[in-house]
UniProtKB/Swiss-Prot annotation:
Biological source species: Idiomarina loihiensis (strain ATCC BAA-735 / DSM 15497 / L2-TR)
Pathway: Amino-acid biosynthesis; L-lysine biosynthesis via DAP pathway; (S)-tetrahydrodipicolinate from L-aspartate: step 4/4
The EC number(s) this enzyme carries: 1.17.1.8
Positions annotated to bind NADP(+): 35
Protein name: 4-hydroxy-tetrahydrodipicolinate reductase
Gene: dapB
Amino acid sequence: MINVGVFGASGRMGQAVIQALADDNEAKLGAAIVRKSSNSYGDSATENEPVHFISADELQPEQVDVLIDFSLPEALTENLKLAEQYQLPIVVCTTGLSEEQKERLAQAAETVPVLYASNTSIGIALLEQLVGISSAALPNADIEIFEAHHRHKKDGPSGTALSLGQAAAKGRQQSWDQVNDGIRADGLRSEEGIGFSVMRAADIIGEHQVTLAVAGERIEIGHRVSNRKTFADGALRAAKWLEEQAPGFYSLQDTLNLQDILQRMLKQ
């Protein structure tokens, strides 16, 4: 049985992961980690297991085998220090990370297994692959990405939307910095630019659509999430996989073995 520690355990996604663990036969909640200022601090985190909400400095290494981080970007540095100190694999699902914070992830991956996924949906992992293949096959297509989330989401474009843009650029062997148009204030696209449209409304959990358009036709590849359990299940699946890996920097695609699947299909 794998013991899982959850950062941001009192938040919406933290609670979804705790519920997923309660329904799982291979893993269980080892630690529910929150800030000491949280209203949940000290309370019971589960109904059936004697696990209470604790702060990060109260975590004991024997409590957990792997960590899942659904906390805020400002907590990342301390969370990574804890993973490094106790040599624990960590799945980082926090969105809105800066480039400096992403570099810190890569640094931590030199000593512990780190998996970074701004979106832990298996469907999104597949979508990124499809976008990369499609952009490579249609090198002259205009690419636009639309994303929609709930009204309280703070970052935009979402980390997932940016990952899709990066997948498209990689498919064309382009520099992401050179083709990223961002959210265009004037509506004008650059020659090879990849642009973004953003919606924040009501309780939308997550929608992403990538459009590849050429004269006379277009391809639209999309993904919608209707339940946060999708993300929790994906994060837990990633944590189980990561617990068995050597130190390194991994993505959700690595857990799905998509490269081998694609190579096998191409040989048929």
